């Protein structure tokens, strides 16, 4: 298994895996793949997005992404630098082999290298045990509103 950072040359293979992930638990609008592709083309080679993958024999079998952003310093995060872990997904045939755990570990290390001091994520029920094992704790006082 080869673990690595993805680049624009990997875009199509990453998009296939991301769409497989999203479709595994929700309906996805018809144009969502194009919207995602446009976003990735704009951000993949910048400092505000990192894509990691596990690859076996030329096929992506797992991947995740981290979106980076900075806010005003907070008491619990004086740097104000955050990473948001997104779309950790492993193909079903490769699950329960520690692949996602290794990818998340890589994401955390890469985030630290960028000065990030707090990582956030939204989790599925399937992913909760992994994130708790790694040391993530649920944050109860979080809200959002569609605009």
Where in this protein do the model-derived segments appear?
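Conserved active-site alpha-helix within GNAT-family acetyltransferase domains
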Residues: 101, 113, 117, 125-145
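Conserved hydrophobic beta-strand within the GNAT/NAT acetyltransferase core sheet
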Residues: 85, 118-121
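Conserved acetyl-CoA binding element of GNAT-fold acetyltransferases
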Residues: 76-92, 141-144
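A short beta-loop-alpha structural element at the N-terminal edge
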Residues: 2-16
